[in-house]
């Protein structure tokens, strides 16, 4: 299957004759421009003569792929070609367990409260005109292209509302992308429309030419063969899998017939001592609900087999073209997922490990094989890390994340964070759900059994802390209960026991203060020492206003 019209007599290497760029064409920069790029941006590059040897970067992004429930199990080739050839992170998190806010954080290196991207709608700033004007010029791909001279290639799902007529339609190509093959709106496998450098192309339901994961694989291989060889490249390939509707390729539709959703300790149990949205789930789940989520779990794994094929093809092509040894490859997901945990059928959005923890595998120059890192990283670190690879200083950006390139290269005596912020603004319907008339307005994502996965006051913020002594999660809800959840994940990895009422009050106060600090952080202040870091300083007076009242928690309809 080929998406690009390639000349039969075209050599297999060379400039992009038929790959037309999404923004104005990106020829190799003249020597003076290259010098300006080096001096003004990517200072890590040691001279124009070495520009062709700057590292390439590939970012592979899955959609809704969990880590906690075994989401990497189907990806045997991916684990062998990336994880075993480099580093696997066992503590990788997202700052918001929902597609658009998480993807916006990846692109910008910022927490949701600094983006005001709060959900998957235009009103929630997902690919809105405001996002396009304020944030897109400052994404790390835009910096790679404008300041570092990288060719930039995108293929797949961008943001959930991309292509909306009220926000430029499919003609909008975000600043910073040389080659643009973006899916209109949310993940599909057939019957979708792509923006090919700003021009719409419809696809049907013929597997050989339309199955989206394979389409993305083929157009990516074409880019590798027909790009310019005079400049480094960055590729972002964003697959639909394993997002619903979970349509597997024909050859994989009978795979994993004996696989079921994991029956771990928090499967199909009541969420005791948790906030009301979790407590409202019906326990035990009905047989029909369990059959549904088992089927969904199986189909999710089936769709990932095509992603595994994509990764294999990509790595083999990089090797064939002589570029593999000079290319960093990242594999991750935008959020986790749950299937029956605390009797919630299927979704993401919640604060628990299964929704906020994601796979992260990296290989590349200077990374030793077969490594596992326990260092606490987040998807806001991807942009800073990739810019660091390109030689661009994080200090020139307003990003909240940190570069973990030193971790990848085995730096010793490294000063690193001990906590990250997780924040989410709940969504609800203004009217009663017609399928569940007994429920009040304000809930959403409801299933036929009238179990709802979201609500207006499912709005929370958490500090996820990992240090030598502590493995904690502290969360506060913006609801009438003023609910707090705290978990010691060393003793309670499945988050069964909320210890908010039994934990040391002094520690609780420190965590509350740290949460407020992180919710108001921006740029460098997001990287200050956490509660358990040696450099941390706690002044309880800062928790009180001049009037002596306890400082209020920082929630608003825009998450700050």
Curated annotation (Swiss-Prot):
PTM comment: The conversion to 3-oxoalanine (also known as C-formylglycine, FGly), of a serine or cysteine residue in prokaryotes and of a cysteine residue in eukaryotes, is critical for catalytic activity.
Gene Ontology molecular function: glycosaminoglycan binding; metal ion binding; N-acetylglucosamine-6-sulfatase activity
Example of a GO biological process term: glycosaminoglycan metabolic process
Compartments where found: Lysosome
Pfam families for this protein: Sulfatase
Cofactor dependency: Ca(2+)
Region of interest: Disordered: 1-25
EC number: 3.1.6.14
3-oxoalanine (Cys) PTM sites in chain numbering: 99
Glycosylation site list: 119, 125, 191, 206, 218, 287, 325, 370, 395, 413, 430, 457, 488
Record-listed Ca(2+) binding positions: 63-64, 99, 334-335
Active-site positions on this chain: 99
Recorded GO CC terms: lysosome
Signal peptide positions on this chain: 1-48
Primary location recorded for the protein, binned into one broad class: other
PROSITE patterns per UniProt: SULFATASE_1 (PS00523), SULFATASE_2 (PS00149)
Catalytic activity: Hydrolysis of the 6-sulfate groups of the N-acetyl-D-glucosamine 6-sulfate units of heparan sulfate and keratan sulfate
Entry-annotated residues carrying Phosphoserine: 549
Family: Belongs to the sulfatase family.
PANTHER family the record matches: N-ACETYLGLUCOSAMINE-6-SULFATASE, N-ACETYLGLUCOSAMINE-6-SULFATASE FAMILY MEMBER
Annotated protein name in UniProt: N-acetylglucosamine-6-sulfatase
């Amino acid at each position: 299957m080929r998406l690009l019209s390639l000349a039969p007599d075209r050599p297999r290497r060379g400039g992009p004759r038929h790959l037309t760029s999404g923004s104005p064409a990106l020829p190799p920069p003249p020597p003076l421009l290259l010098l300006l790029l080096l001096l003004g941006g990517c200072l890590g590059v040691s001279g124009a003569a070495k520009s062709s040897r700057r590292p390439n970067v590939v970012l592979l992004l899955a959609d809704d792929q969990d880590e906690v429930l075994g989401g990497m199990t189907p990806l045997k080739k991916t684990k062998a070609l990336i994880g075993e050839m480099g580093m696997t992170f066992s503590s990788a998190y997202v700052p918001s367990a929902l597609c658009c806010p998480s993807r916006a954080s990846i692109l910008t290196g910022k927490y949701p409260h600094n983006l005001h991207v709060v959900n998957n709608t235009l009103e929630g700033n997902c690919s809105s005109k405001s996002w396009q004007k304020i944030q897109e010029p400052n994404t790390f791909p835009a910096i790679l292209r404008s300041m570092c001279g990288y060719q930039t290639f995108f293929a797949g799902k961008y943001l959930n509302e991309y292509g909306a007529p009220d926000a430029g339609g499919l003609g909008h190509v975000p600043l910073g992308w040389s080659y643009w093959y973006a899916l209109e709106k949310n993940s599909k496998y057939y019957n979708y429309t792509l923006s090919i450098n700003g021009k719409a192309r419809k696809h049907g339901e013929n597997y050989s030419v339309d199955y989206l994961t394979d389409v993305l694989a083929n157009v990516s291989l074409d880019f590798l063969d027909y790009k310019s060889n005079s400049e480094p490249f960055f590729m972002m390939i964003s697959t639909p899998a394993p997002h619903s509707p979970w349509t597997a390729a024909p050859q994989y539709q009978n795979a994993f017939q004996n696989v079921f959703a994991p029956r771990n300790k928090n499967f199909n149990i009541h969420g005791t001592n948790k906030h009301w949205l979790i407590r409202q789930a019906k326990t035990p789940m009905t047989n029909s609900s369990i059959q549904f989520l088992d089927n969904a779990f199986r189909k999710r794994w089936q769709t990932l087999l095509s992603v595994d094929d994509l990764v294999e093809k990509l790595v083999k092509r990089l090797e064939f073209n002589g570029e593999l040894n000079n290319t960093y490859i990242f594999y991750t997901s935008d959020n986790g997922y749950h299937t029956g945990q605390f009797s919630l059928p299927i979704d993401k959005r919640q604060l628990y490990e299964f929704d906020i923890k994601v796979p992260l595998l990296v290989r590349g120059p200077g990374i030793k094989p077969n490594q596992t890192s326990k260092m606490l990283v987040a998807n806001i670190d991807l942009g800073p890390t990739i810019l660091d690879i390109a030689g661009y200083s994080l200090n020139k950006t307003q990003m909240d994340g940190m570069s973990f390139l030193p971790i990848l290269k085995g730096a010793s005596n490294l000063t690193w964070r001990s906590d990250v912020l997780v924040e989410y603004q709940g969504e609800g319907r203004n009217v009663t759900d017609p399928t569940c008339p007994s429920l009040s307005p304000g809930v959403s994502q409801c299933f036929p059994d009238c179990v709802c996965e979201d609500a207006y006051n499912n709005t929370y913020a958490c500090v996820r802390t990992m240090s030598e002594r502590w493995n904690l999660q502290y969360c506060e809800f913006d609801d009438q209960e003023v609910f707090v959840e705290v978990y010691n994940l060393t003793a309670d990895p499945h988050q069964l026991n909320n210890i908010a009422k039994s934990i040391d009050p002094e520690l609780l106060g420190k965590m509350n203060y740290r949460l407020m600090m992180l919710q108001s952080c921006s740029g460098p202040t997001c990287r200050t020492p956490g509660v358990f870091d040696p450099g941390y300083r706690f002044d309880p007076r800062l928790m009180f206003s001049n009037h002596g009242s306890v400082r209020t928690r920082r929630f608003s309809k825009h998450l700050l």
